[in-house]
Regions:
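Conserved small-domain helix->loop->beta segment predominantly found in fold-type I
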Residues: 281, 292, 296-344, 354-371, ...
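N-terminal glycine-rich, Lys/His-bearing helix-loop that initiates the first secondary-structure elements
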Residues: 1-72, 194, 421, 425-443
Length: 443
């Protein structure tokens, strides 16, 4: 075993990290845990290799076996999403979005998307808002798109269809993008796509948060509802490695996507994660529908349990959510604990990991992302650990102890650790003797 002190220090920190997650309740809505089978593929020799170019047309030699892996990966993904073409070159969901923007827009074209303050993702963000004030963003800014926002019902947590129809006709964008990072309910794709096409807009659906629910047939079906393309990361409700994919609804879009993907947006496309994604897709083909159903059941059950304990879970009249995500207004704790950042830190001390999040009305209350009025909760990772509805009651009790009863978070952390003892293996995946957060040692 290596004895270098710096190596040993790095390893000791990694071991602490793995130990923390083995004893925590993971509720980040944008994360998940891969199976040991996926991790095995992701640390294969492919971590060292390049495969520029397309299957059978590589720039580098030595890729005959990787070609087989990528071909199988794409075949499985096309089956899951019922699509004629999928590209797995993007190394993230943001790069997948950037690929679509590159394929179907040019600089200064107009894009309409969900704004960040009401739950939109930064990859739809502009360089500047229409007001001229700097907002920030990633792919939208890099593409230098002129971004305006789809009208949104900030209290119903969904797009305002009537106002959106009017706005699309007035704005005449080149691209309309659905999807969000606070994605509680299906977006009205079927209602708005004909209007977007009427003005000549390309319609993309950013499925990063809900791709697993879509593949598991428990959410909407954007391609059948009219979207031209769908982009997604592969590590949220779809429990694969961190990567991105672009999905086309029809063959005539393929060449533009391919040109944008390579040599446009990617060179090396992280072959080890393609292999991991292939295994994740094989797992999802077998277990995905049951997993997706339980993810939504758990989210609804946790929302109800928190609501019954006095927490202001948004949209109770709509059943809280139709996805994996809950949004909780914690502004009533402002005087006892603080706002979102303070609540997030207090939960983290108790080994409960949920992130602060803007509420759609925070901008009215003059709150910002550094210390917003909400927290966001996701059920997808705890579902992967085998938790079901009865465990949602226990988790809600922990929230009550920490935030309402103001119990010492360190004491609650011990209770959380004891609770987690029964949930150490991956469910809805291929069997393994490895635990979910085991650290793989070389010696």
């Amino acid at each position: 075993m290596p004895s270098d002190p710096e190596f040993m220090k790095i390893r000791s920190i990694l071991l602490k990290h793995h130990d923390y997650w083995s004893n925590a309740i993971p509720l980040i809505a944008s994360e998940n845990v891969t199976s040991p089978a996926v991790r095995e593929a992701a640390i294969s020799d492919l971590v060292h290799r390049y495969a520029e170019g397309w299957i059978g047309e590589r720039v580098y030699p030595g890729n005959q076996y990787f070609d087989e892996i990528e071909e199988l990966c794409l075949k499985l993904l096309k089956e899951l999403f019922n699509a004629p073409f999928i590209d797995a070159r993007p190394i993230s969901g943001v790069v997948a979005n950037l690929t679509v923007y590159t394929a179907f827009t040019k600089a200064n074209d107009k894009m309409m998307a969900i704004s960040i303050p009401v739950g939109g993702h930064i990859s739809s963000g502009p360089l500047k808002a229409t007001t001229g004030a700097f907002i920030g963003g990633t792919a939208g800014a890099v593409s230098r798109l002129d971004v305006s926002y789809i009208p949104f019902d900030r209290y119903g947590l969904n797009i305002d269809v009537d106002k959106a129809i009017k706005a699309i006709r007035e704005t005449k964008p080149k691209i309309v993008q659905f999807g969000a990072s606070v994605f509680l309910f299906p977006h009205p794709v079927q209602d708005l796509t004909p209007i977007a096409h009427e003005v000549g807009a390309h319609v993309n659906y950013d499925a990063a948060h809900v791709a697993g629910l879509i593949a598991g047939k428990q959410f909407q079906d954007p391609l059948r509802e009219g979207a031209d393309t769908m982009t997604t990361s592969t590590h949220k409700t779809f429990p694969g490695p961190q990567k991105g994919i672009v999905i086309a609804s029809r063959n005539e879009l393929i060449e533009k996507i391919k040109a944008a993907a390579f040599p446009g947006m990617t060179s090396n496309h992280h072959l080890m994660h393609v292999a991991g994604l292939a295994v994740a897709a094989a797992e999802f083909k077998k277990f995905g529908e049951a997993y997706s159903k339980q993810v939504i059941k758990n989210a609804k059950a946790l929302g109800q349990a928190l609501y019954e304990r006095g927490f202001k879970v948004v949209c109770p009249e709509k059943g809280f959510t139709e996805s994996h995500t809950l949004l909780v207004d914690i502004s009533n704790f402002q005087h006892s604990i603080g706002l979102g950042a303070d609540v997030e830190h207090r939960l983290e001390k108790a080994h409960i990991v949920a992130n602060r999040n803007l509420l759609p009305w925070d901008i009215i209350e003059k709150r910002n992302y550094r210390n917003p009025g909400g927290i966001r909760i996701g059920s997808q990772e705890i579902t992967r650990l085998g938790m079901k509805e009865k465990e949602m009651e226990v988790i809600a009790d922990f929230f009550e102890s920490i935030l309402i009863d103001l119990k010492n978070p360190t004491e609650v952390a011990s209770e959380v650790s004891e609770f987690r003892e029964d949930f150490q293996t991956i469910h809805y995946g291929f069997e393994s003797s490895w635990k979910a957060y085991d650290y793989i040692k070389i010696a």
